[in-house]
Amino acid sequence: MAKKPDSFYFDNYVACADLAVQAAELLTKIFENFDPAQIHDMLNKMHAIEHAADKKHHELEDALLTAFITPLEREDLDLMSCALDTVLDRIEGVVQRVYFTNIQSIHPDAIVIAHKVTDACRAMKDLMVELPNYRKSKTLRELVIQINTIESEADELYINAMRNLHVNGKDPLEVIAWRDVYAFLEYCADCCENVADVVDSIVMKLSLIHISEPTRRRGI
């Protein structure tokens, strides 16, 4: 487990990932119970979640500026924070596009992808919870693979949704609007995968350092 002084960073990541889960669940709720008259209020609720994530991101950056010793490389800690923050930005971006393109009803394909984004965010939170155990974890790699798999499934859903949109869409303006919404939904899954890739890269780097230490001690 990470030492107590280090827990701030890992706790921050878990908090950000939890906010991502909240945002994804809200997005799914908006789609499943869609009411055009309520979309502005829903956008404000989503922005409040995104703003809370921004605050967490800034808290971590402020801590990095003054920290003498950090549990991981500063660049890696900041990269992870930025990656998590981007997930929230993209989820909010979906609702923004539904709002400013004045979408009046939600396509069933969008609800399916939103559920997949929620799955990715939940797995991402599990990954952040497990991250402090990176030295001995037996599940960290499995969670990375799980998120990669969910992202691949989201990609396939996105392709099918875009196909349905262009085959069945009658209103050119509606097609354009939904192309943008679908793209941002797919970005959400991509960003979750990016978080997993950052974790994978950090753990790989630490493994190489751990392997090289005995060699340096032997003077090889």
Residue ranges of predicted features:
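Disorder-to-helix initiation segments
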Residues: 1-16, 35, 69, 73-77, ...
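Secondary-structure edge/capping motif, primarily at the C-terminal ends of alpha-helices
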Residues: 24-38, 60, 64-71, 94-105, ...
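Short, charged, amphipathic alpha-helical segments
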Residues: 40-47, 74-78, 108-111, 141-146, ...
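Long amphipathic all-alpha helical oligomerization modules
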Residues: 135-208
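Single conserved hydrophobic/aromatic residue that forms the stacking wall/gate
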Residues: 209-220
